[in-house]
Amino acid sequence: MTPTAAPLFLAADVGGTRARFLLARWRGPEADSPWEPLSRRVFADDDFPHFDAALDAFLAECPLGAEPKLAVIALAGPVTGRRARLTNRPWTIDADALSARYDWPRVELMNDFAAQAFGL
């Protein structure tokens, strides 16, 4: 798979005070690191009225033409179906709405504690 054809992946960790974003490219399991980070950013949640505004700010800083096809968002709050609401901030995140808005074929939401467990 050539680097230009390799899929891009957006990961986010959204808490009550900060939203962390990563855009990376898949390099394959043979590489020292299977993902090549392209852009990283941490934002203060207080600077944005809702999650989509923080996400828009991150995407605006990403390399031109960098369009992820997969997004996984871990957040501090319960996930019910394809929607989630942060426990300590009045933000609601809807996976289907994000998929439609950004034309992303796959958007997954998970509780941040569950995401931490997957990382162990």
Q: Which positions does each model-derived feature cover?
A:
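Short glycine-rich, Thr/Ser-proximal phosphate-binding strand/loop in the N-terminal lobe
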Residues: 2-57
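Short, flexible, glycine/charge-rich loop motifs used to bind or transfer phosphoryl groups or to couple energy/partner
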Residues: 1, 31, 61-62, 97
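Short beta-strand-loop/turn "lid" adjacent to the catalytic site in phosphate-handling enzymes
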Residues: 62-120
